[in-house]
Amino acid sequence: MVLLSALLAREVAGDRAGLITAFIGAIYPFLWVNDGLIMSESFTGVAVVGTVLATYKAARSPNQWWRWLLVGLLGGISALGRAELVLLVPVIAAGVLLAPRIGAIRVRLIASALAGVALLLVLAPWFIYNSSRFEKRVILSTNDGLAMVASNCDEAYSGNVIGLTFLRSADCLPAPPRGDQSVVAEEYRRVAFKYMSENASRVPIVVLARLGRDWSLFRPADMLSWNVAEGRPRWVTSLGLVFYYPLLLGAFVGAFILWRRKRWIWPLLAPGLVVSLGAIFAYGQIRFRAPAEPFIVILCAIALSAIGRQGASNRNEDPLTQ
């Protein structure tokens, strides 16, 4: 992931940004902590960075149609790791359609369509397989029902634990109905939506709490003990948060610099948008923002690179240094 992140930063902002990204990425705990957990985050992180890198490469040569197929292919691989990442290619495609710099509208339409077709081709075998083994329709996973029902209950809607999930609570996790996991997921979704409709006034507050937890902007200390239960040592989460806040601030600066330079920034922001959408419909957890972590590092590195370059330029222009 570090290598791909460095290559992406180099593609967007030059060699200096790539080197800074490689250095920060090698020591940033939230980039390497998931590797030892044998969970999907490490795999999907690589695939997401690869998808965005392929997007920038394709945008440089928009008439090389195979490049857009590669974008969809890598996006499909990302979605097989985490279901919410099925939104990544559509979100990127929306940015392509709205970016005149890529080419004429015809080129952008074809590019977006090719990426979408490739995404569907990657997901089709899994969808067909699921259609043959479950009673109800399952596109990617049956986990959505479980995540929704355990995150839409009294415990998750109030108090100090608002915005989290409760898989071990009998009040939050009702007895499953008869049938396979697709039947269970369908029933859990029904229960979750019913609870949401009955508590509609609380939903906006809960959504804000979920987003705040996802981005460590609301009660971040809660994740110290929460992450221990998932196999992350307490000290790693603490160290990760020490790194995270300066990097996040730097990422905002980097995004602003790219915007001022009229560079195409949308693909770098797309993973963060998808991560946020996932939190809105599930619950907030540091691990869920793993696909967006490399882009925080990249944008911060771009800011540091620009500041360093500006400083060097000022020294060269200072007559006292001549």
Question: Predicted regions: what is each one?
Answer:
Residues R16, T51-L70, V96-G103, L304-I307:
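Membrane-interface transmembrane helices that cradle and orient dolichyl/undecaprenyl
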Residues F30, G36-T44:
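Short acidic/glycine- and proline-prone juxtamembrane loop motifs at membrane-interface regions
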Residues S61-W66, P100-L114, P233-V236, F252-A270:
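Membrane-interface helix-loop-helix junctions at transmembrane boundaries of multi-pass membrane enzymes
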Residues R137-P220:
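Membrane-proximal stem/loop segments at transmembrane-domain junctions that anchor or position
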Residues G18-P29, V33, L53, G75-A79:
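Short helix- or helix-capping micro-motifs
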Residues M1-A13, G50-A54, L249-V253:
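Transmembrane-helix motifs of polytopic, lipid-linked glycan transferases
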Residues Y195, V203-L268:
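Membrane-interface anchor segments at the N-terminal boundary of transmembrane helices
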Residues V2-I27, V46, R60-W66, L70, ...:
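Transmembrane-helix signature of polytopic, membrane-embedded enzymes
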